[in-house]
């Protein structure tokens, strides 16, 4: 049964390996295209989605947050099970909830603009020999990395800065100034996990930061080099953009007033 328009929010998880990123493209080979196709099949309506953060080709989503408007009346469990019926194995809706929505008001939930912060994780395999089992799921560096040196270097990035050095030339963000709340670097055996938490990220920002930290970790640069890069605000002096394979959109933070589900989301390589 159909009724008034309502706003539904989904928590979506996906393996980015087979997809050309999140944002819709003419070829239809994106996560957004496939999700909207599944939603349209389930609702028998045309559905347009808005996400919290657009990921590039090969980048994974542990918990992407998406909203859309619909007049369809369904309970939340039906949204999860029904939409997943039309999704491929590499994409799944993990949860669904309805948020208060008044088209005549400005203070409505928005997956992107209501987000207070984002968290990304980068998983790196540090071993002389690559692992075929981690292909597409973790980046790879064969030279031994010094985690303590990288931790020292990362401290220069904390706080509010102009991150122009770490943005791509295609970045469309209005301002390069972002607030980095924390950077955590952990090691378990041959795996190194970088966890970056900021109010927002520029295009390629995480991959560019990780690439530059690797230069510090392998001894090619000193930890203070990160401060020089930050102050220089020139992309060409930083390390090349690192591979997308190990990058995960891990968590989006919202005001508790929206009452979104708070699920424990762990990177399967780190659990």
From Swiss-Prot:
Reactions that this protein is recorded to catalyse: uridine(38/39/40) in tRNA = pseudouridine(38/39/40) in tRNA
The organism's place on the tree of life at top rank: Bacteria
Pfam families assigned to the protein according to its UniProt record, in alphabetical order: PseudoU_synth_1 (PF01416)
CDD domains the record matches: PseudoU_synth_EcTruA
InterPro entries recorded: PsdUridine_synth_cat_dom_sf, PsdUridine_synth_TruA, PsdUridine_synth_TruA_a/b_dom, PsdUridine_synth_TruA_C, TruA/RsuA/RluB/E/F_N
Active site: 56
Residues in the signal sequence: none
Residues reported in the UniProt entry to bind substrate: 120
GO biological process: tRNA pseudouridine synthesis
E.C. number(s) listed in UniProt: 5.4.99.12
Keywords, alphabetical: Isomerase, tRNA processing
GO molecular function: RNA binding; tRNA pseudouridine(38-40) synthase activity
The family this protein is said to belong to: Belongs to the tRNA pseudouridine synthase TruA family.
Function: Formation of pseudouridine at positions 38, 39 and 40 in the anticodon stem and loop of transfer RNAs.
PANTHER family: PSEUDOURIDYLATE SYNTHASE (PTHR11142), TRNA PSEUDOURIDINE SYNTHASE-LIKE 1 (PTHR11142:SF0)
Subunit annotation: Homodimer.
Protein name: tRNA pseudouridine synthase A
Organism: Janthinobacterium sp. (strain Marseille)
């Amino acid at each position: 049964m159909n009724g008034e328009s309502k706003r539904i929010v989904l928590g979506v998880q996906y393996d980015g390996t087979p997809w050309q990123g999140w944002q819709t493209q003419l070829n239809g080979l994106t996560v957004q295209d496939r999700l909207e196709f599944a939603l349209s099949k389930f609702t028998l309506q045309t559905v347009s989605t808005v996400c919290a953060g657009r990921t590039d080709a090969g980048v994974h989503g542990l918990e992407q947050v998406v909203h859309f408007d619909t007049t369809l009346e369904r309970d939340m469990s039906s949204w999860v099970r029904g939409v997943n019926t039309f999704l491929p194995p590499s994409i799944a809706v993990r949860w669904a909830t309805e948020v208060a929505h008044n088209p005549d008001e400005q203070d409505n939930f928005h997956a992107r603009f209501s987000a207070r912060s984002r968290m990304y994780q980068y998983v790196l395999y540090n071993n002389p020999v690559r692992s075929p089992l981690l292909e597409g799921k973790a980046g790879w560096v064969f030279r031994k990395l010094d985690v303590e040196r990288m931790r020292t270097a990362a401290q220069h990035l904390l706080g509010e800065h102009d991150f122009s050095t770490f943005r791509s030339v295609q970045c469309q963000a209005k301002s390069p100034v972002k607030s980095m709340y924390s950077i955590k670097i952990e090691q378990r055996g041959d795996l190194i996990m970088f966890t970056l938490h900021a109010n927002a990220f520029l295009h390629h920002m995480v991959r560019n930061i990780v690439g530059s930290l690797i230069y510090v970790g392998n001894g090619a640069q000193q930890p203070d080099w990160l401060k020089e890069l930050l102050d220089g605000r020139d992309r060409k002096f930083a390390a090349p953009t690192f591979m997308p394979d190990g990058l995960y959109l891990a968590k989006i933070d919202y005001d508790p007033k929206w009452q979104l589900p708070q699920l424990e989301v762990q990177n399967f390589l780190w659990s």
